[in-house]
Amino acid sequence: TERPDFCLEPPYTGPCKAAMIRYFYNAKAGFCETFVYGGCRAKSNNFKSAEDCMRTCGGA
Protein backbone atom coordinates (compact mmCIF):
# COMPACT_ATOMS: atom_id res chain seq x y z
CA THR A 1 0.00 0.00 0.00
CA GLU A 2 1.09 3.55 -0.62
CA ARG A 3 1.70 5.86 2.29
CA PRO A 4 -0.43 9.03 2.47
CA ASP A 5 1.13 12.25 1.14
CA PHE A 6 1.04 13.86 4.59
CA CYS A 7 3.66 11.34 5.74
CA LEU A 8 6.17 13.41 3.75
CA GLU A 9 5.39 16.62 5.66
CA PRO A 10 7.91 17.91 8.22
CA PRO A 11 6.89 17.95 11.89
CA TYR A 12 4.85 21.01 12.89
CA THR A 13 5.04 22.29 16.48
CA GLY A 14 2.27 24.88 16.01
CA PRO A 15 1.75 28.19 17.83
CA CYS A 16 0.72 26.83 21.25
CA LYS A 17 3.09 26.08 24.12
CA ALA A 18 1.95 22.75 25.60
CA ALA A 19 5.22 20.92 24.74
CA MET A 20 3.79 17.43 24.21
CA ILE A 21 5.98 14.66 22.83
CA ARG A 22 4.47 13.31 19.62
CA TYR A 23 5.71 11.20 16.72
CA PHE A 24 6.12 12.08 13.05
CA TYR A 25 7.20 9.96 10.10
CA ASN A 26 10.66 10.95 8.90
CA ALA A 27 10.51 10.01 5.21
CA LYS A 28 14.28 10.45 4.71
CA ALA A 29 15.11 8.10 7.60
CA GLY A 30 12.25 5.68 6.87
CA PHE A 31 10.92 5.55 10.44
CA CYS A 32 9.04 7.59 13.03
CA GLU A 33 10.77 10.02 15.39
CA THR A 34 9.67 12.24 18.27
CA PHE A 35 9.10 15.97 18.11
CA VAL A 36 7.65 18.59 20.46
CA TYR A 37 4.04 19.51 19.66
CA GLY A 38 2.53 22.68 21.09
CA GLY A 39 -0.99 21.30 21.48
CA CYS A 40 -2.97 23.07 18.74
CA ARG A 41 -3.30 23.28 14.95
CA ALA A 42 -1.92 19.79 14.39
CA LYS A 43 -0.97 18.71 10.90
CA SER A 44 -1.65 15.15 9.77
CA ASN A 45 1.93 13.90 10.32
CA ASN A 46 1.39 13.95 14.11
CA PHE A 47 0.80 10.75 16.07
CA LYS A 48 0.35 9.95 19.77
CA SER A 49 2.38 6.74 19.49
CA ALA A 50 5.18 5.34 17.35
CA GLU A 51 2.93 2.36 16.61
CA ASP A 52 0.19 4.56 15.11
CA CYS A 53 2.81 6.46 13.13
CA MET A 54 4.36 3.33 11.66
CA ARG A 55 0.96 1.76 10.99
CA THR A 56 -0.09 4.82 8.98
CA CYS A 57 3.16 5.88 7.31
CA GLY A 58 5.73 3.11 7.67
CA GLY A 59 4.18 0.32 5.64
CA ALA A 60 4.96 1.38 2.10
Curated annotation (Swiss-Prot):
Its main location: secreted. Gene3D superfamilies: Pancreatic trypsin inhibitor Kunitz domain (4.10.410.10). SMART domains: KU (SM00131). One of its GO terms (molecular function) is serine-type endopeptidase inhibitor activity. Disulfide bonds join C7-C57, C16-C40, C32-C53. This inhibitor has activity very similar to that of the basic protease inhibitor from bovine tissues. This is Serum basic protease inhibitor. It comes from Bos taurus (Bovine).
